[in-house]
Amino acid sequence: KNFTMFTEKEQSGYHNLCRITHLEIINFAIKNPDKKVIIKPKWGGKWIDYIYNLAHKENIDLESIKNLVINEKLNSFDLIENSSVVIAFNSTTILEAAIKNKVVIIPNFAEAEEKSLKGFVMLRKFFNLFEIAESSKDLYEKINLGCKNPGKHKKFLQKRISVYERYISPIKGNQIEKCIGILKKQIQYNTFK
């Protein structure tokens, strides 16, 4: 199984958290050549450039790390399905991976613990359902442990599903059909002139 890092929103105030998290994941890939490590930014372009520039500043040649993939075009749902560990911050990916019973690591250090930004960290009241990395060292250790014990959160699955349903959508039933039905009803009441 893989482990995947989803780089979600470009957080204006979480620069050190972002930098440290990416470097620690790259470091994990370097030290664990037998593990496939995937970083999936939400967007390409400057987001990919950011990761390459970050590595370059640390004298790391990303192209030489054969087990590391950085690609924004990969299918998120396939990545979650095929990963044992998922790292995300302020993203629905946290809950999407949680209901698949994955080890979900939320980096929660640097600016995420500063008084001015602490209140903007999503799902904080549900942190007990996830692995919370409180430092770069803790992040590395949690990735390592997650790869060794990918099913450790089974006891939280029902609670994770409840949180998913609260913030995303009910799991039961065909959500696509429900959305189409809602849109059809809405369309009949709206006219374009």
What is each PLM-predicted segment?
Residues I39-P41, A88, I106-N108:
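Short beta-strand/turn micro-motifs composed of small residues
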Residues K1-K57:
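Conserved catalytic-core segment of nucleotide-activated headgroup transferases in glycan assembly
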